[in-house]
A protein has these predicted regions:
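Conserved AAA+/SF3 P-loop NTPase catalytic/coupling segment centered on the Walker-B
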Residues: 97-124, 138, 153-162, 174-182
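Walker A/P-loop
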Residues: 33-70
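Dynamic helix-loop-helix/coil hinge segments at AAA+ ATPase domain boundaries and subdomain interfaces
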Residues: 1-25, 214-215
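Conserved alpha-helical scaffold flanking the Walker A/P-loop in AAA+ ATPase domains
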Residues: 28-31, 84-104
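C-terminal engagement/docking regions of AAA+ P-loop ATPases
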Residues: 1, 235-321
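Conserved AAA+ ATPase core "coupling" helix
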Residues: 75, 79, 155-209, 217-227
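P-loop (Walker A) phosphate-binding loop of NTP-binding proteins
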Residues: 44, 78, 146
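AAA+/SF3 P-loop NTPase mechanochemical coupling elements
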Residues: 92-101, 130-147, 158-167
Length: 321
């Protein structure tokens, strides 16, 4: 376990050369990498979301591509297309930017549904079809999609079924005053600071195997299942004491959320140098895993209740094993 903790600490140290005050964002993205899942990031422009994922790709020695999603984007612009070569009289494949290890899907909610579907299909299946041929995407394959919480005009909201495919949703906030002072003094020179490759793709895959092997007691699994049960409105009819929570939820989390929570909890334990999962690991990842999987009711909007507040209430309500 110590070697994995050392590798992750090296990754954090390299990221800190460029990124100030975004320790939580870095740790959460690294968690998603090891858990082999994709991430949706919400935050206003200028909070170093692009710099964070680009830096992590460099540290891991992975190929990085950025796709700027716009209303006029076509699925072929993402996945690739067939090009007719007149001198040969044949079609050749031109692969799209999705053929990379790390993809930044910038402002994914700016593109129409058919483009979102093409991107999300690639995320889920790890392959794309161009013409009549199906092509495997490179491994490891990681997508970080961003969306802006403001300026919602001209956007296409991601359907709940598609949101569920993201392992985590991260919310990036403004840096603290002392960190912002350091950022301003750097005058935007952070992207030019060199970083070293400290974790190879082979080591990343090895770390994923180690995370899968983390011990998880049945009591922890029961704890996760109980958390999911309270997110479902039907639970209010069986457990009246949870009604104060479920009345704010229109649709709850699916079993996929439980799988994601267990995966992330195992990685959290690995990063802490443990070979077993504690309830604290589940609590540490609960907000990131659940916040985009809860569809809130009109009552929640009326009372100005957020998904994070509901998740906090659920964690307080469920007994810790």
């Amino acid at each position: 376990m110590e070697k994995y903790v050392e590798l992750i600490n090296k990754c954090r140290a390299e990221c800190a050369k460029r990124l100030v005050g975004q320790d939580a964002l870095i740790n959460d993205i690294l968690t998603a990498f090891v858990a082999d899942g994709h991430v949706l990031v919400e935050g206003v422009p200028g909070l170093a979301k692009t710099l964070a994922i680009k830096t992590i790709a460099e540290i891991l020695g992975l190929d990085f591509k950025r796709i700027q999603f716009t209303p006029d984007l076509l699925p072929a612009d993402v996945t690739g297309t067939l090009i007719y070569e007149q001198n040969k009289g044949t079609f050749s494949v031109r692969k799209g930017p999705v053929f990379a290890n790390v993809i930044l899907a910038d402002e994914i909610n700016r593109a129409p549904a058919k483009v979102q579907s093409a991107m999300l299909e690639a995320m889920e299946e790890r392959q794309v079809t161009i013409g009549e041929e199906t092509y495997k995407l490179p491994s490891p394959f990681f997508v970080l999609a961003t969306q802006n919480p403001v300026e919602q005009e001209g956007t296409y909201n991601l359907p709940e079924a598609e949101l569920d495919r993201f392992l985590m949703k991260l919310v990036v906030n403004y840096p603290a005053a002392e960190n912002e002072k350091l950022i301003v003094k750097s005058c935007g020179k952070a992207p030019a600071i060199p970083v070293q490759t400290v974790l190879t793709p082979v080591q990343l895959l090895d770390m994923r195997k180690a995370a899968d092997g983390i011990t998880c007691d049945d009591k922890i699994v029961d704890y996760i299942v109980n958390i999911l049960a309270v997110t479902r409105p039907v639970a209010a009819t069986k457990e009246k004491s949870s009604h104060d929570i479920t009345r704010y939820i229109h649709f709850g989390a699916s079993p996929r959320a439980g799988i994601a929570m267990l995966q992330c909890a195992k990685v959290n334990a690995l990063f802490a140098g443990r070979d077993f999962v504690l309830p604290e690991d589940v609590k540490a990842v609960a907000n990131n895993v659940l916040r985009h999987r809860l569809v809130l009711s009109y009552e929640a909007a009326a009372d100005n209740i957020t998904a994070d507040e509901i998740i906090s209430r659920i964690l307080d309500f469920i007994p810790v094993p």
